[in-house]
């Protein structure tokens, strides 16, 4: 099964190492794109802004407004706040993939994930990739998996004139979009 909306967001927060596991307290308002704020009846009214630490709390604490939603959550079938329903349906639609690749939250998260990899694995790209795969796969790795990813990052550097930082940022975004990260067996 695919992870639910809240599980996807929480997994990304955990992967980048910023999840706040504080229990209880008021709801939080994570950053949302300006286009989402502009769509509310009164631009941004009532949404507020939590500190970065509070915004990284688990998704169960995210403020829910019927007229305004966090894009990642709404695109991944968050609970319908307008009606009661004993079952939450799971869809797989192109907008989910587009949001996961192009959304502000995912791209910012990929950069933070890449920073975590640099801090934990040092400056060797192979070690950074190995650490990324350990985090997203949560299982022992095969050397061929690491080698393929190292080759892909080296291609980004050589063929697309990216520096190592930007190449790792893009690989981090790819890693957070892997099926094995988003689906459970």
Sequence positions of predicted segments:
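Glycine-rich, flexible loop segments associated with nucleotide phosphate handling
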Residues: 51-54, 164-168
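Globin-like tetrapyrrole-binding proteins
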Residues: 171
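An acidic, gly/pro-interrupted, aromatic-rich
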Residues: 1-136, 140, 175-185
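Short, charged, surface-exposed loops that flank catalytic or proteolytic processing sites
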Residues: 123-125, 158-167
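Amphipathic alpha-helical segments that form the core helices of the histone-fold
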Residues: 147-158
